């Protein structure tokens, strides 16, 4: 597939740009976040839907950073978006476009609207605008600009006042947004006032910039949150005023929390990087996010390849999806059990090094891989795997948690003293020999295996939860395992 480069496209709004549109054959989607310091989980789903739709059609998925807020658009904030998308496995097909760098192009489009009579200069003062608002409130009307400079002679412009440029929105009729999710959404034009295109300081506004960028990037389908529906009506008018083809729209209901309210910080983690640090796998997040508002029959589990094959806009629901943390956790557990042990070990080490300051070596990695079948069987996150393997890093004598200490009563410590002598007599420290010895010891003591295994686990891990105890003993090695048992024996 050919690569896309915005800089190769002509900057004008004339024949060159129209040629781009007529040559366009490929489905092209985009994700256009504003840097906030993290990739919001709702934005991650939007990016995923755009990515899946482009991949389904053999098209292109592009990335645009809407960085016009220079204070918030710091390098770390922008990097957080890149890192979040990369972690999720959502690759883009061209160099990212930075909206702020295209301000001159946006101003060029405003001038074309002025030349076409589709925009005008407005010299209304802040005091006049405030009086408009107060009057509308007093009369119980929506607050709209009243168009006082719409048809006024520019010669009447007050001296020394820098105007804004407003769009000449149609006064009558309606604007219809034909949406793949919401159907036809109708907006009476009288409710869409003459929005500002260019501020008095010469900077372009959001709706103008988005239209110009989407046109120049040859975007064919705009998939985004339904909080942009009104923007879609305004943007459609700007497209038509410039003589450009309007892209197809799909406005997706926002994600809600378990309580039905819009997803917010009080519901828990919001950024993609937070889920990474909580120990979720990217393939689990992709599977979960695509099912938030989209469905394929009763299928819950499917690969990324299946999602690409099945994804379509018509199967996106019109009602907000609720984020279910327990469901995500269970889904993540499934993907952990399916994952390669070496990969899980490497990702767990990276995660716990980042979160807990782990210091590990190749020997630890080998032990972690050996224990992984038992560790991942019940784990729902990589953090749980890390906690389950932490006993490998501690030094003697172990600090036991409260539950482990309760198990290590005088009777249990005496039992361990008798067991350790039996284990010391073993020549081969291999799993099968260890298991045979411990089981035989339990029978001789007339005890169920659990009555021996529980204090043994507490002694060698400092916890009541661990991978299978025989795996633990074999992985620790003879000297370390016997030393830990002796430390707790009576």
Curated annotation (Swiss-Prot):
Species assigned in the record: Parvibaculum lavamentivorans (strain DS-1 / DSM 13023 / NCIMB 13966)
This protein is called Glutamate--tRNA ligase 2
> At which positions is motif 'KMSKS' region?
262-266
Against PANTHER family, the record matches this protein to:
GLUTAMATE--TRNA LIGASE (PTHR43311), GLUTAMATE--TRNA LIGASE, MITOCHONDRIAL-RELATED (PTHR43311:SF2)
Q: Which residues bind ATP?
A: 265
Subunit structure of this chain's protein: Monomer.
- Keyword check for Disulfide bond: no
Lineage of the native species?
A: Bacteria, Pseudomonadati, Pseudomonadota, Alphaproteobacteria, Hyphomicrobiales
- Specify whether Iron is a keyword of the entry: no
Catalytic activity from the UniProt record: tRNA(Glu) + L-glutamate + ATP = L-glutamyl-tRNA(Glu) + AMP + diphosphate
Record function comment: Catalyzes the attachment of glutamate to tRNA(Glu) in a two-step reaction: glutamate is first activated by ATP to form Glu-AMP and then transferred to the acceptor end of tRNA(Glu).
Extract the GO molecular function terms from the UniProt entry.
ATP binding; glutamate-tRNA ligase activity; tRNA binding; zinc ion binding
